[in-house]
Design a protein with these regions (language model features):
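Small-residue-enriched hydrophobic alpha-helices in membranes
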Residues: 1-126
Length: 126
């Protein structure tokens, strides 16, 4: 996977975690699990942490989508499959999370059903 994929995924994961206004322990543990599962190098994670300090949601979204739109179709599908699985982690899917997923999937030029199929083929995050 490319640096664009890793960074774009991290930006959108952060945005999804914060979408409902509650970043609970399960979601934060899921961030670490995603980092490990997707083999995101520590230097990329540190770059992400530094770059996102104080960023507002709109800036996170713009940066994440820009990075993901520079990815292959397969990387895009994988990104949104991971995000779909992440939305299930805390046991409740908030309306803001659904809106974010649907808008992001549309902006990336993907079909929702394709994302769902990829997500269902992935193991649960936690």
């Amino acid at each position: 996977m490319t640096a664009n994929y890793h960074l774009g995924l991290l930006y959108l994961v952060r945005l999804l975690i914060d979408a409902d206004g509650i970043a609970d322990a399960k979601e934060l543990a899921a961030l670490q699990a995603i980092k490990d599962r997707e083999n995101i190098p520590e230097e990329i994670f540190e770059k992400f942490e530094e770059a996102t300090q104080g960023m507002v949601h709109a800036d996170l979204y713009t940066a994440g989508i820009t990075l993901i739109n520079g990815c292959s179709y397969e990387e895009k599908l994988r990104t949104f499959g991971v995000l779909y699985r992440l939305s299930e982690v805390d046991g409740r899917v908030h309306v803001k999370e659904i809106r974010l997923l649907l808008n992001s999937i549309n902006t990336a030029g993907l079909e929702f059903d394709a994302v769902v199929n990829v997500a269902k083929a992935m193991p649960v995050i936690l």
